C-alpha cells in the first residue's frame, strides 16, 4: 500500500472515530423475557452441578457468516440439547452428550447484517457492498469481505450495517429464540451477546493488515428485563464505557454481567495495571470492574489463559494448550505479550493492588466455554466439528501443511463452564456466576468441589451428606475468608467424568504477597492416584501414559476414579494476603489432532502434542488478614 494513502487513511479514521455520535443502544425500550417462579424438580439446597457453554456463535455473527456458516441461533440451542444440526461439510453433527445450559453470544457488531444481505426484499439486499459479497466472482467477493473486516478492525463501521431499526429487529429475535428454548429444570438458555473490542494496532498496516488486541467480553442477561439493544464496540471500545452502560441498564431493572475472555491474545492488556486509556488505577475503576465482571472465561478454542511457561517456569503442567496468535493479519499472525495476559499472574497482581486500595480488581471466578463459530459447542476431542466454518471444515483442512494449518492445529477443542446451583434455572445459574461458585474445564465433565473452614470435625467423605455439611461448616470456591492464626482447612473433592479418563492428581495452587510487597506462588500436590509416592524434594512422579497413538485410544489402567482430601497450608502466614485454587489433571488422552490423523490414516502432526492431560480449575478462595 502507498504510504501516502496509508497515512491519509489512518488520519481520516482518527477523525471519524473522534466524532461524537449517538450510541445505537441509547433510548430503546426494554425487552420482557420469561421469569421462572417456584422450585423445579431438580432443586437441591446442597446444589447441583451443571455443565454449559456461555459463548457460542452462529451465522448471525459476521465472522462466522464470512466463513460460510449458516447455522441459526435456534439450531445452536437444539445442538446443545443433543439434536443433530447441519454442518458446513454437508454432514450432520451431534454432541455425544447434551449440555445443561448455553448462551448464543453472537457479536453485537453487524449482528445478523450479513444474513440480511442475502434476503431479497431486505433493505440491505441491493446495497453495493452486499452485491459484491454475493458476487460469483471470487476476487470481488473476497475484496468486499476484506472491506468489512477492515471496518471492524479500525472501528469504522458502515452506517448501513448499524441502522438502529435493523439491529433492534435482529436483537429482539435473538432474545425471543433464547426464551423459546428455556425449559426451567431441564435446560437454561440465556439472552447474551459479545462486545467485541478488538483494539487495532494500526502501525501494522505498513507491513500488512492490522492485528488486534483482544478485549472481548460476553454480556449475559439474567432474564426478566433485557436491554432493547446491545452496547457494541462501535459505541465504544473502552470497557469502562461498557460498564457505565451496564450500570444504566441496572437502573432500569436489567440484571447483567460481563465475562472477559482470551486474555492470552490481549497483548498484555486484559490484566494490565492501568486503565484502557493508560491512566493509573483508581478505587472507582476497581470497584466498577469488580461489580460488572465477577467471572472470566479462561479456556476455549483459542487456548487457555490460566498460566504460561514463561510466567510460571517451575510449573511442569503450565505448557498446556498455549495459543498466542494475534487476531487479524490472516496467517501471518504475530505472537503476543504474556505479561498482563494470564490469570494466575493477575491473581497475584490483584493482591498487590488490594494492599494499596483495599480492593482487588482481579478477584474473579473462572469458567470455560468454547467460542465456537460453527453454531455448536465443540468440546469433544474425538468429535471435533471445527471452530469456524471453512477455516477448519474437516480433518484434511485442519492438518494441512501451510501456515494456516499450523495456526489451526494450535487451537483447542475446549472448554466448559461448570456451575454449582440449586436448580437449572436462569436465576439460580446466574446467581452462581455472581458468587463465583463456578469452575472451568478443558472439556471433560470432572466433578470438583472446593471448600474452606476453620474446622471440619463433623464432615466425613463416608457420610453421603458431606456436601450439605460442608456448606454448613465452611465456604465454597469463590469466597473470601479472613480469620485465623492457623491455616484454614480446605476440603477438596474431584470425581472423574463418567465417560472420560481417570484422574492423575489434584493440586492446590497458592499465591501470596509478603510484607515487602513481593508476590509469590507455589504448587502443592495434595491428592493423587495409587502407585506413586512423593520424593524427598516434594516432587510426584508422572502418572504414566497409556495412549496408543496408532489408533488414538487410551485405557483407564492408571489413575483414580476420585480424589478426596482435607488439606491445610504448611506455609501459612496469617499476615499475608493469599489465594488458593485447585487444578485437577486427568491421565493423558489423545489430542484432537491425533484423532484427526488416525481418521485419515496419516502421520500424527509433530508440531503439537499427540496426547494431553485434560483438566479442571476451580475458582479461588481468597484469604485476607483482618487488619
Report each predicted region and the residues it spans.
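C-terminal functional module detector
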Residues: 20-73, 77, 84-126, 133-134, ...
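The substrate-binding groove and active-site-proximal loops of carbohydrate-active enzymes
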Residues: 62-67, 155-168, 222-236, 332-341
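Conserved, charged catalytic cores of large soluble enzymes
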Residues: 225, 235-240, 318-321
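C-terminal motif of bacterial Sec signal peptides marking the signal peptidase cleavage site
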Residues: 16-18
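Residue-level signal for mature regions of secreted extracellular proteins and peptides
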Residues: 12-13, 611
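Bacterial N-terminal signal peptides that target proteins for export
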Residues: 1-8
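Aromatic- and acidic-residue-enriched carbohydrate-binding clefts of CAZyme catalytic domains
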Residues: 128-157
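Cap/lid and interdomain-hinge subdomains that line or gate substrate/regulatory clefts
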Residues: 162-171, 210-214, 220, 234-259
Amino acid at each position: 500500500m502507498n504510504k501516502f494513502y496509508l497515512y491519509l487513511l489512518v488520519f481520516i479514521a482518527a477523525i471519524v472515530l473522534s466524532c461524537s455520535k449517538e450510541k445505537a443502544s441509547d433510548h430503546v425500550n426494554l425487552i420482557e423475557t420469561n421469569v421462572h417462579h417456584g422450585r423445579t424438580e431438580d432443586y437441591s439446597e446442597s446444589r447441583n452441578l451443571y455443565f454449559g457453554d456461555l459463548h457460542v456463535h452462529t451465522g448471525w455473527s459476521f465472522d462466522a457468516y464470512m466463513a460460510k456458516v449458516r447455522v441459526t441461533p435456534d439450531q445452536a440451542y437444539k445442538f446443545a440439547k443433543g439434536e443433530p444440526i447441519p454442518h458446513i461439510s454437508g454432514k450432520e453433527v451431534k454432541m455425544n452428550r447434551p449440555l445443561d445450559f448455553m448462551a448464543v453470544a453472537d457479536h453485537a457488531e453487524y449482528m445478523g447484517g450479513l444474513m440480511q444481505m442475502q434476503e431479497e426484499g431486505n433493505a440491505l439486499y441491493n446495497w453495493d457492498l452486499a452485491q459484491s459479497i454475493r458476487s460469483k466472482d471470487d476476487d470481488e467477493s473476497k475484496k468486499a469481505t476484506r472491506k468489512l473486516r477492515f471496518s471492524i478492525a479500525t472501528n469504522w463501521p458502515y452506517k448501513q450495517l448499524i441502522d438502529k431499526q435493523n439491529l433492534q429487529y435482529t436483537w429482539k429475535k435473538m432474545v425471543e429464540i433464547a426464551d423459546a428454548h428455556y425449559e426451567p429444570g431441564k435446560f437454561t438458555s440465556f439472552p447474551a451477546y459479545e462486545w467485541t473490542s478488538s483494539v487495532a494496532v494500526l502501525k501494522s498496516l505498513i507491513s500488512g493488515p492490522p492485528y488486534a488486541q483482544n478485549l472481548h467480553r460476553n454480556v449475559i442477561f439474567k432474564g426478566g428485563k433485557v436491554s432493547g439493544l446491545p452496547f457494541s464496540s462501535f459505541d465504544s471500545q473502552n470497557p469502562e464505557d461498557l460498564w457505565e452502560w451496564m450500570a444504566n441498564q441496572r437502573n432500569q431493572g436489567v440484571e447483567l454481567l460481563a465475562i472477559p475472555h482470551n486474555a492470552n491474545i490481549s497483548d498484555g492488556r486484559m490484566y494490565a495495571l492501568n486503565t484502557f486509556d493508560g491512566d493509573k488505577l483508581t478505587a472507582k475503576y476497581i470497584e466498577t470492574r469488580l461489580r460488572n465482571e465477577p467471572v472470566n472465561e479462561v479456556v476455549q478454542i483459542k487456548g487457555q489463559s490460566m498460566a504460561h511457561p514463561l510466567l510460571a517456569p517451575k510449573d511442569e503442567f503450565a505448557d498446556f494448550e498455549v495459543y498466542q496468535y494475534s487476531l487479524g493479519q490472516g496467517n501471518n499472525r504475530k505472537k503476543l505479550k504474556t505479561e498482563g495476559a494470564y490469570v494466575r499472574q493477575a491473581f497475584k497482581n490483584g493482591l498487590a493492588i488490594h494492599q494499596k486500595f483495599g480492593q482487588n480488581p482481579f478477584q474473579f471466578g473462572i469458567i470455560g466455554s468454547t467460542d465456537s463459530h460453527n453454531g455448536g459447542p465443540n468440546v469433544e476431542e474425538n468429535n471435533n466439528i471445527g471452530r469456524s466454518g471453512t477455516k477448519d471444515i474437516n480433518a484434511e483442512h485442519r492438518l494441512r501443511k501451510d501456515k494456516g494449518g499450523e495456526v489451526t492445529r494450535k487451537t483447542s477443542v475446549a472448554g466448559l463452564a461448570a456451575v454449582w446451583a440449586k436448580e437449572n434455572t436462569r436465576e439460580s445459574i446466574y446467581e452462581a456466576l455472581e458468587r463465583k461458585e463456578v469452575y472451568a474445564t478443558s472439556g471433560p465433565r470432572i466433578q470438583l468441589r472446593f471448600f474452606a473452614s476453620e474446622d471440619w470435625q463433623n464432615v466425613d467423605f463416608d457420610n453421603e451428606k458431606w456436601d450439605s455439611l460442608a456448606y454448613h461448616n465452611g465456604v465454597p470456591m469463590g469466597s473470601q475468608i479472613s480469620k485465623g492464626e492457623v491455616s484454614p482447612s480446605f476440603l477438596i473433592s474431584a470425581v472423574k467424568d463418567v465417560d472420560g479418563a481417570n484422574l492423575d492428581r489434584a493440586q492446590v495452587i497458592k499465591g501470596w504477597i509478603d510484607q515487602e510487597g513481593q508476590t509469590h506462588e507455589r504448587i502443592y500436590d495434595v491428592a493423587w492416584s495409587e502407585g506413586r509416592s512423593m520424593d524427598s524434594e516434594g516432587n510426584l512422579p508422572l502418572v504414566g501414559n497409556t495412549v496408543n497413538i496408532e489408533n488414538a485410544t487410551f485405557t483407564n489402567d492408571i489413575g483414580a476414579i476420585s480424589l478426596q482430601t482435607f488439606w491445610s497450608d504448611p506455609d501459612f502466614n496469617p499476615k499475608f494476603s493469599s489465594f488458593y485454587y485447585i487444578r485437577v489433571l486427568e491421565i493423558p488422552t489423545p489430542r484432537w489432532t491425533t484423532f484427526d490423523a488416525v481418521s485419515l490414516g496419516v502421520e500424527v502432526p509433530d508440531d503439537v502434542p499427540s496426547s494431553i492431560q485434560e483438566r479442571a480449575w476451580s475458582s479461588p478462595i481468597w484469604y485476607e488478614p483482618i487488619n
